[in-house]
């Protein structure tokens, strides 16, 4: 059986940082983060882990530039273009325009972008996208089965597709529970039909994460899914103070039980997307002379997205609910349970 890109274990001027593994190499992988920083315990960090894994596996050089604001995107990308990068990886939907402009101006430079797909595709850009609604559907069903108040909540960082896809899947998972059980669990914070909901309009203010979770808790939610990168750490702090009997958090992107160890006990689970694995695969393809524009898509079936283990809360999740989640996972994979419209 061949190498599976998703069977590996791991957001967004300017300070240039370099990391080397082993001896200096002729191959250099470069990355531009979105706001939030390289060590955000979530989006940027997970993508950077893919570079770190490639350093360990292949002995390449890795560099990154951190974007402190959206105004840094163009300058950061252009700086790396001048830095002899064999592949430039940009992290996040918001870097889509800047990446496209740079790619068109530098057609011989390979690029890859996390969470963006170009239509029509660009010949020198490989997009990395994820069917996170599939895993979030499982999280919504789980939350509906675990809530005591019959109210769950979610909020996003910015109203963009890579954020709302989590919220869509979560809401549909709750709807599926209600339909199967004749129940009436309510989702606060997102209306999939109206495309309206709660958004902090940033990915880095932990105080907003606390405040938004507090508002949802005050309205009765006892499980909250923050889809806002490091902002969600503020929600976890609130859950830590209130106690998990009153508020549980569902993480996103990485398994926050491992990346947010100080508050790991508040996470019921996490909706993970394996950016580390796709970044690693892009680097390997490029090293092997196999780079071409197009898309890599992470799904439940190939392990590109998933629902993390319940860890410390495993004993709280009924065996019947676990069995139902396994059956739903199989149904999503074989197409008998529809998630996307």
Question: Where do the language-model regions lie?
Answer:
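Secreted/extracellular small peptides and ectodomain modules produced from precursors
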Residues: 1, 15-16, 28
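Sec/Tat signal peptide C-region and signal peptidase I cleavage site
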Residues: 20-26
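Bacterial N-terminal signal peptides that target proteins for export
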Residues: 2-12
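A residue-level marker of the well-folded mature domains of exported/periplasmic proteins
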Residues: 26-341
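Cleavable N-terminal signal peptides
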Residues: 12-14, 24
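Secreted/luminal cysteine- and crosslink-motif detector
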Residues: 18-19, 31
